[in-house]
Amino acid sequence: MAKVSLFKQDGSQAGEVTLNDSVFGIEPNESVVFDVVISQRASLRQGTHAHKNRSAVSGGGKKPWRQKGTGRARQGSTRSPQWRGGGTVFGPNPRSYAYKLPQKVRQLALKSVYSTKVADGKLIAVDTLDFAAPKTAEFAKVISALSIERKVLVVLPNEGNEFAELSARNLENVKVTTANSASVLDIVSADKLLVVQSALTQIEEVLA
C-alpha cells in the first residue's frame, strides 16, 4: 500500500496516510490521460465563431445589372460569394466542441494522474484546512509552511470548507477544487496536489 506523509496546517508532520493502491498505486495509462485531457480542453472552447453568408451580409438587394443584353455574366446580387464584400461560403458557425468519454475511461485517467503524483512525491496530505474566517494571508501561511512554491491544486472535501475555498481564491498559482470535482486537466496542470485527508477518503470511495 502506498503511503504519504500527513502534515498539519502549520507544516509540522502529523504521521502518515495509507492510500488505496487501486486508486493511488496503479500503472498510469498515458494514452487514456491524453484522451481525457483533449476532451476536457475541447469542452472549454467557447465555440462562438460565426460568419455571414450572402443572406446575412448587409446590402446587395438590388440586381447590379439587367439579366440579358449587357454581354456580362448574369448577377443577382453584389453580396454573392464571388463579389468583394460578399458573403462567406461554408464558414464557421457557433457550435459546442464538447464530447463525453465513457465513465470508466475518465475514472482510469483520474487514477492514473493521482498515481503519477504519488509516485513523483507531489501529493501532499494535510489533516485539515480550518479557517475561522476567509483570510488570504492565513492560507498563504499554510502554503509557505508546507514549502509549496509552484502551481498547486488544493483538493477539499465535498462539503464544509467554504472559508478555505474563499481564502485561497485570490492567491496566485493556487487553484481550489473538491474531491468530486477534481478534473484530470486540473491535476495534470498542477505541479503539486494539496489534499485534505477527508478528501482522500472521498476520492477512494468514488474510484476504488
UniProtKB/Swiss-Prot annotation:
Keywords: Ribonucleoprotein, Ribosomal protein, RNA-binding, rRNA-binding
MF terms (GO), sorted A to Z: rRNA binding; structural constituent of ribosome
Signal peptide: none
GO biological process, one term: translation
InterPro entries xref list: Ribosomal_uL4, Ribosomal_uL4-like, Ribosomal_uL4_dom_sf
GO CC, one annotated term: ribonucleoprotein complex
Start and end residues of each stretch annotated as Disordered: 45-89
Stretches of the chain forming a coiled coil according to its record: none
Subunit comment: Part of the 50S ribosomal subunit.
Function statement: One of the primary rRNA binding proteins, this protein initially binds near the 5'-end of the 23S rRNA. It is important during the early stages of 50S assembly. It makes multiple contacts with different domains of the 23S rRNA in the assembled 50S subunit and ribosome.
PANTHER family linked: 50S RIBOSOMAL PROTEIN L4, LARGE RIBOSOMAL SUBUNIT PROTEIN UL4M
Similarity comment text for this entry: Belongs to the universal ribosomal protein uL4 family.
Protein name: Large ribosomal subunit protein uL4
